[in-house]
């Protein structure tokens, strides 16, 4: 009798690590994008929490007038924020080793850059991880495509806009009231409400909410009952079942009669593609709009008032918007400049043609 001994091939530590990283059997999929995502998001989150609680005031305008944003310096959850990097830094890369000391780094708002850049790397890696997991499971890649919309929006306000404006101090502060301040100043300087891409984004967000509510309520209202009247309808559903869980024909008939026939989808794939594409495409457009306004290609501007035959101004809604924009522009960075750019850049008007003669 001949005995055959098979020699087991030893698997290296690196191969075992690669197998574990790319395994779809893990409770949470890691993936190669996850190797980048985990440290960057942990770094951004840790720095954000510490800065929101305890960061010292930041000289955001670069004029030696620090602005406090942390809880320990008198703010609350609503007013608190991580203040953007100083205007004195501009768009220079400002890691902690570029400063003379940690105190200087904190004074110039270094944590803002650290948080924002790690956050953007992290969410981009999360997006890549969605594609990677879909690929390994044999799924189509549309989940990652949909998530690209919020990634594009975040990149626009945190990275592209500061680069276009020439300073990270123009980026969105990392806090509730700071976000609102950013929105008001953005409107004042770029008239974003009159930009067609922003209008598309508003329609995408509100329309997406409406369509999501309509779809969820229609599906929930047309579930196929597999249980008795005394049991919950939900008990009739088995996870992974092949049978339809709701009656799309009934939902289509209901909605077609509620609005009109062609307002309703009778194809489930077309319906779900529309539900995904409507907000995603429009948020892409909004991010593109912010990108164009970063380089001062602004919303529609109606600076010329409507006048009658005698030259008197006939006030329109555009005049009200312009006046509100000027007011907001005057209010922000009040100590950095005395007049908004729209006024300061105008033609100089003589106050007096000649000085009066003074007789002693």
UniProtKB/Swiss-Prot annotation:
| Positions that bind chlorophyll a ChlzD1 | 118
Q: Which InterPro entries match?
A: D1/D2 (IPR055266), Photo_II_D1/D2_sf (IPR036854), Photo_RC_L/M (IPR000484), Photo_RC_L/M_CS (IPR055265), PSII_D1 (IPR005867)
Pfam families assigned:
Photo_RC
Any one Gene Ontology molecular-function term assigned to this protein's record: electron transporter, transferring electrons within the cyclic electron transport pathway of photosynthesis activity
Where on this chain does [CaMn4O5] cluster bind? 170, 189, 332-333, 342, 344
Q: Which residues cross the membrane?
A: 29-46, 118-133, 142-156, 197-218, 274-288
Binding-site list for pheophytin a? 126
| Recorded family membership | Belongs to the reaction center PufL/M/PsbA/D family.
Give the quaternary structure: PSII is composed of 1 copy each of membrane proteins PsbA, PsbB, PsbC, PsbD, PsbE, PsbF, PsbH, PsbI, PsbJ, PsbK, PsbL, PsbM, PsbT, PsbX, PsbY, PsbZ, Psb30/Ycf12, at least 3 peripheral proteins of the oxygen-evolving complex and a large number of cofactors. It forms dimeric complexes.
Query: What name does UniProt use for this protein?
Result: Photosystem II protein D1
Taxonomic lineage per UniProt? Answer: Eukaryota, Sar, Stramenopiles, Ochrophyta, PX clade
């Amino acid at each position: 009798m001949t005995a055959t001994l098979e020699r087991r091939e030893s698997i290296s530590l690196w191969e075992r690590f690669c197998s574990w990283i790319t395994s779809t059997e893990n409770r949470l999929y890691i993936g190669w994008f996850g190797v980048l995502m985990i440290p960057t998001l942990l770094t951004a989150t840790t720095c954000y929490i510490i800065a929101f609680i305890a960061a010292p005031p930041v000289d955001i305008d670069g004029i030696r007038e620090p602005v406090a944003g942390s809880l320990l310096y008198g703010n609350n959850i609503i007013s608190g924020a991580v203040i953007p990097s100083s205007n004195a830094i501009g768009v220079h890369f400002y890691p902690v080793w570029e400063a003379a000391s940690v105190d200087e780094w904190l004074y110039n708002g270094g944590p803002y850059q650290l948080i924002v850049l790690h956050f953007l790397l992290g969410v981009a890696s999360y997006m890549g991880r969605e594609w990677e997991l879909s690929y390994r499971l044999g799924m189509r890649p549309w989940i990652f495509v949909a998530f690209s919309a919020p990634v594009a929006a975040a990149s626009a306000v945190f990275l592209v806009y500061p680069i276009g404006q020439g300073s990270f101090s123009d980026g969105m502060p990392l806090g509730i009231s700071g976000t609102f301040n950013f929105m008001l100043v953005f409107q004042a300087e770029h008239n974003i409400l009159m930009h067609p891409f922003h209008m598309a984004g508003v329609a995408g967000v509100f329309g997406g909410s409406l369509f999501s509510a309509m779809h969820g309520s229609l599906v929930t209202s047309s579930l196929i009952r597999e249980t008795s009247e005394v049991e919950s309808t939900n008990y009739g559903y088995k996870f992974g079942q092949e049978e339809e869980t709701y009656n799309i024909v009934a939902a289509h008939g209901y909605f077609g009669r509620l609005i009109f026939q062609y307002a309703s989808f009778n194809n489930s794939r077309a319906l779900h593609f529309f539900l995904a594409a409507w907000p995603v495409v429009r948020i892409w457009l909004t991010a593109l709009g912010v990108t164009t306004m970063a380089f001062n290609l602004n919303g529609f501007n109606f600076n010329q008032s409507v006048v009658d035959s005698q030259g008197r101004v006939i006030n329109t809604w555009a005049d009200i918007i312009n006046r509100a924009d000027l007011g907001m522009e005057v209010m922000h960075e009040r100590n950095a400049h005395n007049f908004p750019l729209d006024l300061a850049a105008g033609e100089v008007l003589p106050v007096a043609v000649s000085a009066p003669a003074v007789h002693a």
